[in-house]
Amino acid sequence: MSRPTGACPHAWRHQQQPLRGRMWAASPAFRRQLVLLRSLLPSPPAPSSVAGFPPSCPSCSSFLRVRTNHAMAASAGTVYEADAEAVVRRITPPLDRARHKGQAGKIAVIGGCREYTGAPYFAAISALKVGADLSHVFCTKDAATVIKSYSPELIVHPILEESYSVRDDERASVSSKILTEVGKWMERFDCIVVGPGLGRDSFLLDCVSNIMRHARQANIPTVVDGDGLFLVTNNLSLVEGNPLAILTPNVYEYKRLVQKVLNCDVDEETASEQLITLCQKIGDVTIMQKGKADVISDGKTVTQVSTFGSPRRCGGQGDILSGSVAVFASWARHFVLTNEQPTEKRKAASHAFEKNKRSTVTSDIIEFLGKSLEDICPAEH
């Protein structure tokens, strides 16, 4: 059935979306990450010129108004809560039987060593739970078997090496071989996550630095978390001037970034202005400062997500976030390329805590990731 001229192509969703779904949309479950996605979008044109989305549709054009308001007040350091519903509906790909494997996203996690095997698993499996079709992990040989045993859904590559397993006279050749092996896959990925379970071995970090440079040359969005932030803090050129780089520091990682880049301590009195300055100083990156309230900026605007998640601060929740952000970043970029671009993790954490209370662990939160997206974009539609 053809729709009337000027009608919103998503009108059926607006009409059928129950109140409960709208409550999910307004929740932190999507606001937290979708602010990051909006940062990846180019500045929007006037509503009347957005292809397929007439200005008469308030839901589909609301993110345009939000961006305009942000731009007007950015200089004043105003902090906004994100409007996620319109954005998530626009970027989430439909579950179409005509689509083939991989079209909903191919994500790669770069991390995993002898000491840390859980973090890369959490990031990679979260990407699948949110909706990516394929999730890869590039890790050391010591970590590969362990990570493979966690889940048969993950594609695990035992490619990375640590210093103890490489002779000094072999470092150059081994590093080149690692980059070549990862490079064979790079063009297939929609986004990579660097850092979960990476560790701080000097040779391994050098190899990952080369991988990040290769990803940048290939224009692959890169989410940097965990020890990837340690690497970037000590080598800012890896992300300087890269609008496809998303940094997700916790309070300690953010403090180190501020001290390194701005040569000062974190100032709570001017937190939003300092975050904007940090993004601008690094150049074009998006930063999500995790904490009691998550604060997100692309160097132009600042958005805060303060809705309650879970009081349980078990390890691994940041890894869930990085894997989820990678999926949304890939969907947003695909939307931009074919049409003209956080909250989910907090909502999932809240539901997991309601069910498990003090025994809540990271795998319980992962269980609710799919539900968070389903309430916004039902699979049957």
UniProtKB/Swiss-Prot annotation:
(6S)-NADPHX binds at G197, N250, V251, Y252, E253, Y254, K255, R256, D319. It catalyses: (6S)-NADHX + ATP = ADP + phosphate + NADH + H(+); (6S)-NADPHX + ATP = ADP + phosphate + NADPH + H(+). Its cofactor is Mg(2+). One of its GO terms (molecular function) is ATP binding. It comes from the Eukaryota. ATP binds at residues 290-294, 309-318. Keywords: ATP-binding, Lyase, NAD, NADP, Nucleotide-binding, Phosphoprotein. It is an enzyme of class 4 (lyase). The keyword Lyase applies. Its EC number is 4.2.1.93. It holds the Pfam family Carb_kinase. Belongs to the NnrD/CARKD family. Catalyzes the dehydration of the S-form of NAD(P)HX at the expense of ATP, which is converted to ADP. Together with NAD(P)HX epimerase, which catalyzes the epimerization of the S- and R-forms, the enzyme allows the repair of both epimers of NAD(P)HX, a damaged form of NAD(P)H that is a result of enzymatic or heat-dependent hydration. This is ATP-dependent (S)-NAD(P)H-hydrate dehydratase.
